[in-house]
């Protein structure tokens, strides 16, 4: 496996990561007791295989159904936990709800510290405002950093390039998860700006949806 420096996080991240969106029995937030041994064994077998081939970065999200709870149980049962664990939490107008969501994810993943914590889906100006306002989501995450509960702070986005540039220019983030593909390079300027700020750049779903077909206009 090849690795790259992930911007100012200074983490060495593999060029291929293990996405956890499909590590789930359901999109609903089920109790672990509702997940069969067969379903859980699939997750743990994949984690062991990923470890064998050097995929040391695993990412998931609050919105990925049972993914966090299944990964958390998997981390307890496999031989080696991935070096880099990332989860993503949606922005919220109420910082205390956002903090509660972060703490719930840490509990589900059964780890002492989340290496990469992304604000999930900064797709509108309102989302960005909730993230960066005084006393907002970023301030919550800074306090959790001081408690060593999270590492680097990033954001994921399906938003327009102009919005992503605005978020990067706040200089509040260490990395960004965004779309960029061989046949759709609208975010090239965004990536150049991210490089200027030394942000890590993570490409979202490079082989899913319509991204390997002709360009289609998105609406947000």
PLM region spans:
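Structural motif corresponding to the early beta-alpha repeats
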Residues: 63, 78-97, 120-123
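N-terminal binding-site loop/beta-alpha segment at the start of enzyme catalytic domains
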Residues: 1-83
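A short acidic, amphipathic alpha-helical/loop segment
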Residues: 70-74, 166-167, 189-193
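Generic beta-sheet signal
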Residues: 86-88, 179, 202-206
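Helix C-cap/helix->beta junction micro-motif
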Residues: 53, 81, 147-148, 197
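Glycine/proline-rich, positively charged
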Residues: 27-35, 93-189, 199-202
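Conserved small/polar residues in nucleotide/adenosyl-binding loops
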Residues: 210-219
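Anion (oxyanion) recognition and catalysis
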Residues: 51, 191-196
């Amino acid at each position: 496996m090849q690795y790259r420096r992930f911007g100012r996080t200074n983490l060495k991240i593999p060029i291929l990561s293990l996405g956890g969106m499909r590590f789930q029995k359901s999109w609903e937030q089920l109790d672990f007791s509702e997940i069969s041994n067969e379903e859980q064994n699939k997750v743990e077998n994949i984690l062991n295989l990923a470890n064998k081939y050097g995929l040391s970065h695993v990412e998931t999200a609050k919105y990925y159904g049972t993914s966090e709870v299944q990964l958390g149980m998997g981390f307890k049962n496999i031989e080696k936990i991935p070096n880099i664990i990332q989860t993503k939490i949606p922005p919220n107008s109420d910082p205390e709800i956002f903090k509660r969501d972060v703490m719930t994810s840490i509990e589900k993943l059964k780890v002492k510290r989340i290496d990469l914590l992304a604000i999930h889906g900064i797709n509108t100006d309102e989302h960005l405002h909730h993230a960066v306002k005084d006393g907002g989501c970023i301030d919550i995450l800074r306090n959790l950093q001081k408690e060593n509960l999270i590492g680097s702070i990033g954001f994921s986005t399906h938003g327009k390039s102009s919005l992503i540039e605005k978020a990067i220019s706040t200089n509040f983030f260490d990395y960004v998860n965004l779309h960029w593909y061989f046949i759709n390079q609208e975010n090239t300027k965004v990536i150049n700006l991210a490089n200027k700020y030394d942000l890590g750049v993570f490409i979202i779903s490079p082989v899913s949806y319509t991204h390997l077909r002709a360009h289609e206009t998105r609406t947000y």
